[in-house]
Regions:
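Charged, amphipathic alpha-helical linker segments immediately N-terminal to NTP-binding catalytic cores
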Residues: 1-2
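Conserved G1/Walker A P-loop phosphate-binding module
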Residues: 5-83, 100
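Catalytic micro-motifs at enzyme active sites that drive phosphoryl/nucleotidyl and oxygen chemistry
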Residues: 10-13, 78-83, 90-95, 127-129, ...
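Short, flexible loop/turn elements at secondary-structure junctions
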Residues: 27-29, 97, 109-112, 233-236
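Switch II of P-loop NTPase G domains
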Residues: 84-95, 99-136, 147-159
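Conserved GTP-binding G-domain of TRAFAC-class P-loop NTPases and closely related GTPase folds
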Residues: 125-269
């Protein structure tokens, strides 16, 4: 949105709740982060959870963000895919179950985490602040098959290593293989050859899981990795030829259901 300040280091965000676990969606631009948030949010609403945008994330002068908070629920139900992804640059959503806060989910621009055109750029000040915040974090790294070219993928692996250095032992890490429907690994509705999918990620993003290898002399026998791996699909996207609009049709519930189960497991563990 045009209201975003030009200098990335002047961006201010405030996460006031330092107790509730924070889910971070991490990935390059256009990896489907925003639609992942929307798909999960839709699923949770249907399951009876309450979703609340946190208005204090951005300064009150950011009218675009306040509009976004006001229109959040209607945006969850719109079939127009582009509307959501164009509008959301920042979003902090609290997930509640019968009024009790379960977690908060942060969406921030992908290029602030990793810009393929400037892969070694320092993290913006506000992200360093989030990294340092004391609440438990669940780092959700988004990957996809055949993403850009080899050098971009290697740069992304390096970026994940840089982020991993910020991860506290109490935190949890999850790799989300998005757009799984565009791969050959789906064997049925919501059923995926997960081992083959994970190997494909290892082959195409060499060393991506290495920072998460469990080096503990005992527990590593039954848990070699300190990260989880899940396939994901937001849905299908079709262009209406009459108006050029991109429409979104939610995919199988199995994917957001599995993601939520994993997040709950992390939150409680």
């Amino acid at each position: 949105p045009t209201s975003a300040p030009q200098d990335v280091n002047s961006i201010q965000i405030t996460i006031a709740d330092k107790q509730t676990p924070l889910v971070l969606l991490v990935g390059p631009p256009a990896c489907g982060k925003t639609m992942t948030l929307i798909r999960l949010a839709r699923f949770l609403k249907e399951k009876g959870y309450q979703l609340e945008p946190v208005r204090t994330l951005r300064p009150s002068t950011d009218k675009a963000y306040l509009d976004l908070c006001n229109n959040f629920n209607s945006m969850l139900s719109t079939p127009l895919a582009a509307e959501a992804t164009n509008l959301i640059s920042f979003m902090l959503v609290r997930v509640l179950d019968k009024g009790k806060v379960i977690c908060q989910i942060l969406e921030a621009p992908g290029e602030h985490y990793f810009n393929p055109n400037d892969p070694r750029s320092p993290f913006p000040t506000y992200l360093n602040q989030v990294f340092a915040d004391r609440m438990r974090k669940i780092w959700t790294f988004i990957v996809e098959k055949d993403w850009r070219d080899e050098q971009n993928r290697l740069d992304y692996v390096q970026r994940i290593r840089d982020i991993q250095l910020q991860i506290h032992p109490r935190d949890r890490a999850l790799f989300l293989f998005n757009k799984i429907d565009l791969t050959g690994f789906v064997i049925g509705r919501g059923r995926v050859n997960r081992a083959a999918a994970k190997k494909d990620v290892e082959d195409n993003y060499p060393g991506i899981f290495e920072p998460f290898r469990n080096t503990h002399p005992i527990t590593s026998f039954w848990k070699p990795w300190r990260c989880e791996f899940l396939p994901f699909q937001t849905g299908t996207y079709t262009v209406d030829n009459s108006n050029g609009q991109l429409y979104f049709q939610a995919g199988a519930d199995d994917y957001p259901a599995a993601l939520w189960q994993r997040l709950l497991h992390f939150i409680r563990g």
